[in-house]
Amino acid sequence: MSTICAISTAPGVGGIAVIRVSGPDTFKICDRIFRPKKAGKSLSTQKAYTLTYGSIVGNNDETIDEVIAAVFRAPHSFTGEDTVEITCHGSTYIQQQILQSLISSGCRIAQPGEYTQRAFMNGKMDLSQAEAVADLIASTSAGQHRLALSQMRGGFSRELAELRNQLLHFTSLMELELDFSDHEELEFADRSELRTLADHIEQVISKLAQSFSVGNAIKNGIPVAIIGETNAGKSTLLNALLNEDKAIVSDIHGTTRDVIEDTININGQLFRFIDTAGIRETSDAIEALGIERSFKALDQAQIVILMYDLTRDLKDFEAFYQEIAPRLTNKSVILAMNKCDVLPTSSLPTFSFPTEGWHQIAISAKSKLHIAELQQLLTEVSSIPTLHQSDIIVTNVRHFEALTHALEAIHRVQEGLNSSLSGDFISQDLRECIFHLSDIVGEVTTDQVLGNIFRHFCIGK
């Protein structure tokens, strides 16, 4: 195993920077370039969790910078290996010179995510916890931070471990029955107990899988589709919500020909806004493709902002509503009446279609009138429940897919027990359920999958 080094702090100039060195030759390499302020304070002789002040030198023993070196000894470090973290001044030149000095002394530059991958390989964390490290680094809202921290601390892993241990117990008994298959009267695994266990595990896995809709919304943002006729002000509203010119705005009908997405944190909750192409009959093939994507975005949204231009014919809008009405079922709908600044409040229309349960607001996307009120309304209608520290919420697509496969396997176990299926078939489905649960924490994950997961990390992590 080679000894690796990388800058662990964010790129660019800052007050300080941290360079992490990890591997079997960490202390030998660092001692070659570290000059302690006090004699006899070489890093290889220091106790774990100590800080030593000194200098880093380069070629010809020239000082590069005065630094503080933190010592971590295996296995009690992030990677489980001997580790030194060098805190230097934040100059990019200084950082690169220290890296070059480390490389010249025997280190190599770490690959993206290699520190966390080594932590996983050395048993410091399982794969779901490693993925949570990446989520924690990328968190931009309180919800994302809370869920990533909970998963990194192992709550999800412990839940899965309990399920796997129970399944392994009964699987071993089923396998024992197969070893004594010539004695048909022998039954080591009590079928009644196994049925009770299968029902319990089915309930737990179902609950975990169902939590993904909430977890995905917290991690990637609650999907909000901005829907309306052409030139209703959808792109202008997106720009107003984001407070930037994200979408092109024009008086020409059909300007937006594709969906445009961006996220914004409102009161600690992440929303993913989707500006869609105006829905209308068209002979333009490209615009028609954009409208098709608008319908797809509408179907996937949890919240729909339905835009109505108050200066347009109400009958046209009501006809437009009839076209999309079936797609609004079970969605939170906000009817945003745009251009209220050019009409008196008394002129707001009464709609012929049912709007019970909808939220209505008069806005001006162009002048940003009542945009703050619209943002507040979005937080009120979002369906994210109040989460507690002990709640286990699935946020990762890979985990959700594995849980779905495990659920299918446990359903086959239940069906097999109800139909008195042979023990070898039931045992096979039990093993498959265990396999998919183990895949989540990385006990059976292939090198290809591991590489795909860790390459999305930053180099210094």
Swiss-Prot record:
<dbReference type="Pfam" id="PF10396">
    <property type="entry name" value="TrmE_N"/>
</dbReference>
<dbReference type="InterPro" id="IPR018948">
    <property type="entry name" value="GTP-bd_TrmE_N"/>
</dbReference>
<feature type="binding site">
    <location>
        <position position="20"/>
    </location>
    <ligand>
        <name>(6S)-5-formyl-5,6,7,8-tetrahydrofolate</name>
    </ligand>
</feature>
<feature type="binding site">
    <location>
        <position position="85"/>
    </location>
    <ligand>
        <name>(6S)-5-formyl-5,6,7,8-tetrahydrofolate</name>
    </ligand>
</feature>
<feature type="binding site">
    <location>
        <position position="235"/>
    </location>
    <ligand>
        <name>Mg(2+)</name>
    </ligand>
</feature>
<dbReference type="InterPro" id="IPR025867">
    <property type="entry name" value="MnmE_helical"/>
</dbReference>
<dbReference type="GO" id="GO:0002098">
    <property type="term" value="P:tRNA wobble uridine modification"/>
</dbReference>
<feature type="binding site">
    <location>
        <begin position="250"/>
        <end position="256"/>
    </location>
    <ligand>
        <name>GTP</name>
    </ligand>
</feature>
<dbReference type="InterPro" id="IPR004520">
    <property type="entry name" value="GTPase_MnmE"/>
</dbReference>
<dbReference type="GO" id="GO:0005829">
    <property type="term" value="C:cytosol"/>
</dbReference>
<keyword id="KW-0460">Magnesium</keyword>
<feature type="binding site">
    <location>
        <position position="124"/>
    </location>
    <ligand>
        <name>(6S)-5-formyl-5,6,7,8-tetrahydrofolate</name>
    </ligand>
</feature>
<keyword id="KW-0479">Metal-binding</keyword>
<keyword id="KW-0342">GTP-binding</keyword>
<keyword id="KW-0378">Hydrolase</keyword>
<dbReference type="Pfam" id="PF01926">
    <property type="entry name" value="MMR_HSR1"/>
</dbReference>
<dbReference type="InterPro" id="IPR027266">
    <property type="entry name" value="TrmE/GcvT_dom1"/>
</dbReference>
<comment type="subunit">
    <text>Homodimer. Heterotetramer of two MnmE and two MnmG subunits.</text>
</comment>
<dbReference type="InterPro" id="IPR031168">
    <property type="entry name" value="G_TrmE"/>
</dbReference>
<dbReference type="GO" id="GO:0003924">
    <property type="term" value="F:GTPase activity"/>
</dbReference>
<keyword id="KW-0547">Nucleotide-binding</keyword>
<feature type="domain" description="TrmE-type G">
    <location>
        <begin position="221"/>
        <end position="383"/>
    </location>
</feature>
<dbReference type="GO" id="GO:0030488">
    <property type="term" value="P:tRNA methylation"/>
</dbReference>
<comment type="function">
    <text>Exhibits a very high intrinsic GTPase hydrolysis rate. Involved in the addition of a carboxymethylaminomethyl (cmnm) group at the wobble position (U34) of certain tRNAs, forming tRNA-cmnm(5)s(2)U34.</text>
</comment>
<comment type="similarity">
    <text>Belongs to the TRAFAC class TrmE-Era-EngA-EngB-Septin-like GTPase superfamily. TrmE GTPase family.</text>
</comment>
<feature type="binding site">
    <location>
        <position position="252"/>
    </location>
    <ligand>
        <name>K(+)</name>
    </ligand>
</feature>
<dbReference type="InterPro" id="IPR005225">
    <property type="entry name" value="Small_GTP-bd"/>
</dbReference>
<keyword id="KW-0819">tRNA processing</keyword>
<feature type="binding site">
    <location>
        <position position="461"/>
    </location>
    <ligand>
        <name>(6S)-5-formyl-5,6,7,8-tetrahydrofolate</name>
    </ligand>
</feature>
<dbReference type="GO" id="GO:0005525">
    <property type="term" value="F:GTP binding"/>
</dbReference>
<dbReference type="InterPro" id="IPR027417">
    <property type="entry name" value="P-loop_NTPase"/>
</dbReference>
<dbReference type="InterPro" id="IPR006073">
    <property type="entry name" value="GTP-bd"/>
</dbReference>
<feature type="binding site">
    <location>
        <position position="231"/>
    </location>
    <ligand>
        <name>K(+)</name>
    </ligand>
</feature>
<feature type="binding site">
    <location>
        <begin position="275"/>
        <end position="278"/>
    </location>
    <ligand>
        <name>GTP</name>
    </ligand>
</feature>
<keyword id="KW-0630">Potassium</keyword>
<feature type="binding site">
    <location>
        <position position="255"/>
    </location>
    <ligand>
        <name>K(+)</name>
    </ligand>
</feature>
<feature type="binding site">
    <location>
        <begin position="231"/>
        <end position="236"/>
    </location>
    <ligand>
        <name>GTP</name>
    </ligand>
</feature>
<protein>
    <recommendedName>
        <fullName>tRNA modification GTPase MnmE</fullName>
        <ecNumber>3.6.-.-</ecNumber>
    </recommendedName>
</protein>
<dbReference type="InterPro" id="IPR027368">
    <property type="entry name" value="MnmE_dom2"/>
</dbReference>
<feature type="binding site">
    <location>
        <position position="256"/>
    </location>
    <ligand>
        <name>Mg(2+)</name>
    </ligand>
</feature>
<feature type="binding site">
    <location>
        <position position="250"/>
    </location>
    <ligand>
        <name>K(+)</name>
    </ligand>
</feature>
<dbReference type="Pfam" id="PF12631">
    <property type="entry name" value="MnmE_helical"/>
</dbReference>
